[in-house]
Amino acid sequence: MPDATLPACFLSLLAFTSACYFQNCPRGGKRAMSDLELRQCLPCGPGGKGRCFGPSICCGDELGCFVGTAEALRCQEENYLPSPCQSGQKPCGSGGRCAAAGICCNDESCVTEPECREGVGFPRRVRANDRSNATLLDGPSGALLLRLVQLAGAPEPAEPAQPGVY
């Protein structure tokens, strides 16, 4: 009987510690995650001007959003970092954050969102000397383009994003 107590104690100890022993848990255990401060997510996209919103979503104020494209490949690295991150200016939709002008993203998809249109962090104009592929749209042409984008996205508000540029 004494020969069986040592293995039984060892197995009991292993059962209690296996929750964070076999999984990649942070220092302090899973409950310590709420104590950590959120960091800014990794930069991504052309020139590192965007921020990751999920493993396949890269968005920036001047870029728009890249979903499932080569520009968003760097965002897969977020899965391997131990600390949580947060991108975006303000909360929107169901658990999302404003990612670009008029776009709300969570870690799985992006949708058009009126409350993300204009405000802090989403400039209406792009600097003329900026070498990005953005165009200067202000006035009637910009309003028309924004309205067309809203009409195109209105029927499918919760449809998951497909690979492409938004």
Swiss-Prot record:
Its main location: secreted. Disulfide bonds join C20-C25, C41-C85, C44-C58, C52-C75, C59-C65, C92-C104, C98-C116, C105-C110. It comes from the Eukaryota. Keywords: Amidation, Cleavage on pair of basic residues, Disulfide bond, Glycoprotein, Hormone, Secreted, Signal, Vasoactive, Vasoconstrictor. Residues 1-19 form the signal peptide. GO terms for biological process: vasoconstriction. Changing V120I: In 30% of the molecules. InterPro entries: Neurhyp_horm, Neurhyp_horm_dom_sf, Neurohypophysial_hormone_CS. The record marks G28 as: Important for agonist activity on V1aR/AVPR1A. It is found in: Secreted. SMART domains: NH. GO terms for cellular component: extracellular space; secretory granule. The modification Glycine amide is found at G28. GO terms for molecular function: neurohypophyseal hormone activity; neuropeptide hormone activity; V1A vasopressin receptor binding. Glycans are attached at N133. Neurophysin 2 specifically binds vasopressin. Vasopressin has a direct antidiuretic action on the kidney, it also causes vasoconstriction of the peripheral vessels. Acts by binding to vasopressin receptors (V1bR/AVPR1B, V1aR/AVPR1A, and V2R/AVPR2). Interacts with vasopressin receptors V1bR/AVPR1B (Ki=85 pM), V1aR/AVPR1A (Ki=0.6 nM) and V2R/AVPR2 (Ki=4.9 nM). Interacts with oxytocin receptor (OXTR) (Ki=110 nM). Fetal neurophysin is the major neurophysin present in the neurohypophysis of 7 to 9 month fetuses and its sequence appears to be identical with that of the adult. Belongs to the vasopressin/oxytocin family. This is Vasopressin-neurophysin 2-copeptin. It comes from Bos taurus (Bovine). The gene is AVP.
